[in-house]
Amino acid sequence: MTHSPSFLQHALSSSDTRAEWPLPGGLAARWLAPGCVELNGDARGADSVLLSCGVHGNETAPIEVVDGMLTDIAAGQLALNCRLLVMFANLDAIRQGVRYGNYDMNRLFNGAHARHPELPESVRAAELETLAAEFFAGARARKLHYDLHTAIRGSVFEKFAIYPFLHDGRTHKREQLAWLQRCGIEAVLLHTQPANTFSYFTSQYCEADAFTLELGKARPFGQNDLSRFSGIDGALRGLLSNPQANVPDLDEDKLPLFRAKYDLVKHSEAFKLNLADSVENFTLLPDGMLIAEDGAVRYQATGGEERILFPNPAVKPGLRAGIVVEPARLPSR
């Protein structure tokens, strides 16, 4: 192939899942599965970077940003000096322009797909786990995973990150938080328990520095103002072309950190969330407010510094209908 290929178009339309495309500078793009393409730059001792997008099919801006980077790599306009794996994750949902078809894929990682083997999303989540594990098994330096999203609602902090729960004495890395700050990330949630998300899987089982990045509001293809994504676009391009570049130190006073305090679990269809449908992520919860109720179960705000994250009373019983978070600090060095 001599012209610059469209990676996204190939991912969405082609049944050729084992194609290999020669690229400028001796690079090659190798399709490992539908929507999953690996590009090896100067791989000697290089970082291994996984960029995933489209886990929710209607979150299109990250898809456009990543496809733009791939297009520039293919045209020889962006140098690649790391191992790169890109996943356009939920192809069916991307084609349909919906968040998901049958089940939220970002609740099916960490082996949760085994509980719903009949679902197409489960089959895909298992495939993505396998490919990610194989990719990171070949890593010789840093293992980095950024799972790119946009949110279904507005947010007090437009761009924020979720740092998955860390086991076995692992600590939050200031240099990664500093890099996120450089991207334009305005707040970070330090998760306090395991989750069935893609970034938790790669963090725990691949020992990657992994993050879920929420980068703005979900909009259809063609309706995104990509200038609002210039921070993450520029930072990722810098990472791919010059992964060893110095990053300014973390300014903790300018990057609010939060920890998950507890989940709002929807136990039954009687669950009632006492927040407006339009409530934004990270909205402050007044002290004493009855946040939600579900029969005899009551969730009440305390202290006046708690905030709501990902409120969604429409989830199925047994699932999380929101997270209550509170301010956090990193341990002293």
UniProtKB/Swiss-Prot annotation:
Entry annotated with the keyword Zinc: yes
Active-site residues per Swiss-Prot or TrEMBL entry: 214
Entry cofactors: Zn(2+)
A GO molecular-function descriptor: succinylglutamate desuccinylase activity
Any one biological process term the GO annotation gives: arginine catabolic process to glutamate
EC primary class: hydrolase
Catalysed reactions, semicolon-separated: N-succinyl-L-glutamate + H2O = L-glutamate + succinate
InterPro entries according to UniProt: AspA/AstE_fam (IPR050178), AstE_AspA_cat (IPR055438), Aste_AspA_hybrid_dom (IPR007036), SuccinylGlu_desuccinylase (IPR016681)
Keywords: Arginine metabolism, Hydrolase, Metal-binding, Zinc
Cofactor binding note from Swiss-Prot or TrEMBL: Binds 1 zinc ion per subunit.
The EC number(s) this enzyme carries: 3.5.1.96
Binding locations of Zn(2+): 56, 59, 149
Recorded metabolic or biological pathway in which this protein acts: Amino-acid degradation; L-arginine degradation via AST pathway; L-glutamate and succinate from L-arginine: step 5/5
Any matching Pfam family: AstE_AspA_cat
Summary of the function given for this chain in its UniProt record: Transforms N(2)-succinylglutamate into succinate and glutamate.
Family under the similarity heading: Belongs to the AspA/AstE family. Succinylglutamate desuccinylase subfamily.
Protein name per UniProt: Succinylglutamate desuccinylase
Organism (species): Chromobacterium violaceum (strain ATCC 12472 / DSM 30191 / JCM 1249 / CCUG 213 / NBRC 12614 / NCIMB 9131 / NCTC 9757 / MK)
